[in-house]
Amino acid sequence: MNYELIFLAAGQGKRMNAEKNKMWLDLVGEPIFIHALRPFLADNRCSKVIVVCQETERKHVRKLMQQLDVAEDRVEVVKGGSERQYSVAAGLECCGLESVVLVHDGARPFVTLDIIDRLLLGVKQNKAAICAVQVKDTVKRVIHDVVKETVDRDNLWQIQTPQAFELHILQKAHRLAKKDQFLGTDEASLVERIPYPVAIVQGSYYNIKLTTPEDMPLAKAILGELGGKVND
């Protein structure tokens, strides 16, 4: 099953305490987002990559794609929005080559082809699928610094990206969100409102999102554990 990829690289460095877009921070010799993009570039089923980035970085991204020998007709670089949801919407405007679209965070550098395989199977069976891992820690609901209850974690999952959808479903979800002025935290939260059932497939505890400075040493350790290869 072929697919198009909306690759989100328009992030900022506020929580990372970085002076530049965290996507460009170095992770063992390469920008974070290049590690996140490589598995898709290595996947022949990925027919088109839409990189959504800041306007000021579009030229740099195009140059980097050339250095990676990515075919010019395989990648499109577009301007992102002020919110993640608006960036995905900008990417959706460039889709239409395939019936399936994946959305991935450029700040998740440890996605694997195994995860992509499971997602494509999930979207084939359910039309909407996201990867996730079950919550390990005890979770408590807290109000005004006081514990109100301990939440049953048996049905709690930490949601990751990529997330996969039939294109028409994600387009419909975005149209409804725009109409209702709803702002979600991920694509699945929009699709759930249609409403449409979203299937879960197994992600990886390695598939972390790099958000704060504490994440960088962990990322280097994960990369070392994986032998510098995250494509397998």
From Swiss-Prot:
Which GO terms are recorded in the biological process aspect for this UniProt protein?
isopentenyl diphosphate biosynthetic process, methylerythritol 4-phosphate pathway
Q: What molecular function does GO assign, one term? A: 2-C-methyl-D-erythritol 4-phosphate cytidylyltransferase activity
Q: Tell me which CDD domains the record gives.
A: CDP-ME_synthetase
Catalysed reaction equations from the record: 2-C-methyl-D-erythritol 4-phosphate + CTP + H(+) = 4-CDP-2-C-methyl-D-erythritol + diphosphate
**Name of one Pfam family that matches:** IspD
Which InterPro entries does this UniProt record tie to the protein? IspD, IspD/TarI, IspD/TarI_cytidylyltransf_bact, ISPD_synthase_CS, Nucleotide-diphossugar_trans
Report TM segments: none
Q: What is its EC number?
A: 2.7.7.60
- Mind telling me which residues the site (Positions MEP for the nucleophilic attack) is annotated on? 153, 209
Q: Does the keyword Transferase apply?
A: yes
Per the record, the pathway is:
Isoprenoid biosynthesis; isopentenyl diphosphate biosynthesis via DXP pathway; isopentenyl diphosphate from 1-deoxy-D-xylulose 5-phosphate: step 2/6
SUPFAM superfamilies, sorted: Nucleotide-diphospho-sugar transferases (SSF53448)
**Keyword list, A-Z:** Isoprene biosynthesis, Nucleotidyltransferase, Transferase
Q: Which residues of this protein are annotated with the site description Transition state stabilizer?
A: 15, 22
Protein known as: 2-C-methyl-D-erythritol 4-phosphate cytidylyltransferase
Organismal lineage:
Bacteria, Bacillati, Bacillota, Bacilli, Bacillales
Gene that encodes it = ispD
